[in-house]
């Protein structure tokens, strides 16, 4: 039996439930906040479960559940190692660098003065991101030294571990869009353009989804990026730049509600069939 782990039911999760029923897959919904996780014990909520699909909005909650099920010998999509690699932008960048994949110039500083020095060395504008976050939140396009100094001071005052790590990337000029590629297992199954007049193109921030031709180059780079973080079911974000395609991010609990109609691909069905193929 397939367990779909969740902490909030979004349209994406509803689509997964509906497709599981349509495909005739035996499944159960497991609400993670109410799941007792006692090591060495399998709770009644997991009776008969042979594989799990992790769909929690909370990264820490999903990671904890994935670790627990893995300890019980239940395969989880995605594996804890993949969640860790994708959930931390610096970890993602390091994994991509180790795999030799093209990405925007990236650096991390743990000190305000070093962060300022790196921004100056990169040249303005630069992009400052939290190492943990999604939906394009808390991203800043820093246009000059005065803005950099003010932003770094604000982050220091805010406190919190993620504001003490300064993740810095070069600003990449894009053609008003980026590319999101959906990778399931060893296959890139669909891709969309995310268009926006704003430099942040996330659909959660108002970007518009359009079908993107899944070229061999796009598919090959996306699958390699997925493999770099450990594989499974991920969404790979690509930039089109003067240097060619660059991998910007890899997302481990991808949203697809705006992409099924756009691409004509049964993304939830593909995810479910892949997860079911891993049942122990």
Swiss-Prot record:
Reactions that this protein is recorded to catalyse: [amino-group carrier protein]-C-terminal-L-glutamate + L-2-aminoadipate + ATP = [amino-group carrier protein]-C-terminal-N-(1,4-dicarboxybutan-1-yl)-L-glutamine + ADP + phosphate + H(+)
| Pfam families noted in UniProt | LysX_preATP_grasp, RimK
Pathway field? Amino-acid biosynthesis; L-lysine biosynthesis via AAA pathway; L-lysine from L-alpha-aminoadipate (Thermus route): step 1/5
Where, in this chain's numbering, is Mg(2+) 1 bound?
237, 249
Q: Where is this motif: N-[TS] motif that is essential for LysX substrate specificity?
A: 258-259
- Residues that coordinate or bind Mg(2+) 2: 249, 251
Q: List the disulfide bonds.
A: none
| GO MF annotation terms | ATP binding; metal ion binding; ribosomal S6-glutamic acid ligase activity
Enzyme category, top tier: ligase
What is this protein's function per UniProt?
Catalyzes the ATP-dependent formation of a covalent bond between the amino group of alpha-aminoadipate (AAA) and the gamma-carboxyl group of the C-terminal glutamate residue in LysW.
**Identification of the protein by name:** Alpha-aminoadipate--LysW ligase LysX
